[in-house]
Amino acid sequence: MDLLDAHLVPAVDGVAFGLLLFVVAAGLSLAFGTAGVLNLSHGTLYAIGAYTGAELSDGTWGGLALGLAAGTAAACVAGAGLSAATAPLARRGHLAQALLTFGLALIGGDLLIQVFGADELPVRVPEALDTSVTLLGHRYPAYRLCFIVMAVLLAACGTWVLTRTRMGAAVRAAADDPQMLAATGRNPRAVHTGVLAAAGALAGAAGVLGAPIIGPGPGTSENVLMLSLVVVVLGGLRSLWATFFAAIAVGEVQTLGVSLAPDLAPYLLFAAMAAVLVLRSRFAEPAAAHGPEGAAPDPVARLRSRLVAVLRRRPLPAWANRLPGGPAWRQAAPLLVLLLVLVSLPALLDAYSISLAGSALALGLLAVSVTVLTGYAGLPTLGQTAPFAVGAYATANLAEAGWTVGPVQLVLSALAAAVFALVVGPAVIRARGTTVLMITLAIGELTGAVVNQLKSVTGGADGLVGFPATRALWGGEEMLEESRLYTYALVVAVVAVSVTLLVLRSPAGKLLTGTRGAEARMRASGHPVGRYLLVAHICAGALAGVGGSLMVTVQQYLSPADVGFEIAAFALLAVVIGGTTSVIGALLGAGLIVATRDWVAGSWPGHGPLLLGVLFVATVYLLPRGLAGLRGGPGGGNGESGPPSDTTGAPGTPGAPGALGVTSASGASAAEDQPPSAPAPTSAGKASP
């Protein structure tokens, strides 16, 4: 009884927190389950409401009502705008949506900070609620009790609208049978826009009412997004009641769980998320990949097609046609030019720019590992920062222990990352499409929780700094100058990329490509597809570990932000910029991202996220097949292809409610997802004609 009494307040806090998450997650579930939009800017919609409500709060009921109306309306308009923004991506899958909405989240977050400031805003609740009441012998904030009532009413109203009104019937029809909805004379695109507007309104209302609980400030949008994703995954997309109970469970873990088991609670949420996704992926049925009825034409298609046509029609320069060796030499010439430019950078740039170039090489190796998984194995990932973090912290701890020889650090870090990839690989390789994207996200976030909690190894939130510098070889001096560090990073990157290219262009690489393009045929031919994917996952993990080791060597410090979700999104963006099967393109994309984040943003201080967000958006719209797709035939020549569409329904596809876990373990891809250079190998391991 004493134990129950001691934890009563955290338990009630968990109910309030869970109801807040339910309102937010209901909007996210509505957007994803009905409109088919994987909205990674949903936390920003919450932040819009929270900032607006905090700014208009003045301690009166009128201020609360005005803030609720304004915040809900602003987020509703933003949700409707999101419908227009995602319309051009109607048949490109959830990966393109994720990149676009993450870019919009960066832009929105930067604009909110510019308008409201970088500090967390205070929220003034009405004076009548700015007090405490007695609850079973404990003093408890009156506003939180009032919020519980308001959240229950809001949830009840939303459930009634969805299940008892003609509007709700149209929404359900859009999810279950869009063709029938169109036959009744309703415009599915209008329903799609209305659903996203309603999802935004829910997030905005939750932001206004929940601002005293999760206040508006830096990191709010990402925190709300991650918790909402956990709720949606645990509760599923078909049942509001399941979402409700999942939200309450998450709220209790965040409050009561921290009170009862503070060391265990940080790991529970994302571990449960990964476990649920893995189980669903094993018992799911394949989903049809189809586009929305009445999808609007791509407003940037003509601009993009003209750009591609111009670049493809440009003949090679006369000097290129005179190069010896024929087409093979001309294909290698750009690589040699790139290498020449990289080698000459120390003579052309200042020390700071050289250090940025070294960081770009480290991020580039991470991006190349994502290329192996996304472009060749067909496993789009947002969690490759996990083996990247293993390699980085392994190198930092080796340096602290006196193991400062570079090759030793690289080998041991790659080995540690490979072992990590081996352990988590079985959970990843059975899933496909959006499911694997969410599983890898959960693994990445779980690794981030370990980084923050395991202070004896990682330094926690403070990170690691002050460890000895790396020596290039046995008996060598410590590398302290930026030029020496860059040269070391360049040598490591050249070796790693060369090995990767040799493997990908070998028969083993052809087999791996076949697992993405014609998995069912390969299985029928007797190929152990699961084994191929597991080996690819291990090798990609080792490569990411080398990148993490290189980052620590170049930076000479390490913090959780260096291995967080944002870095995972940057790596995926680098892959899309270059073309998902272009290793060199991934390196170029990483260089462009680092230049935008650290060099261009230096001339416009405080606006790095805005510039990166613009880069995300521009890449998704203008480079659907990356830089590699601008020259050559379909797919960008030489087998280059755009980002693989997931198999769970296209953006705006009302039939996407099963996206989290409905794809079969065999993972047959949609036809549009098959790269031109991926014929199914025969049982002898050769490509079939």
Describe the residue ranges of each PLM region.
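Alpha-helical membrane-interface segments at transmembrane helix boundaries
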Residues: 8-19, 87, 137-139, 234, ...
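Transmembrane alpha-helix interface/packing and boundary motifs in multi-pass membrane proteins
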Residues: 28-38, 214, 230-239, 369-379, ...
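Short, strongly hydrophobic alpha-helical membrane anchors
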Residues: 1-9
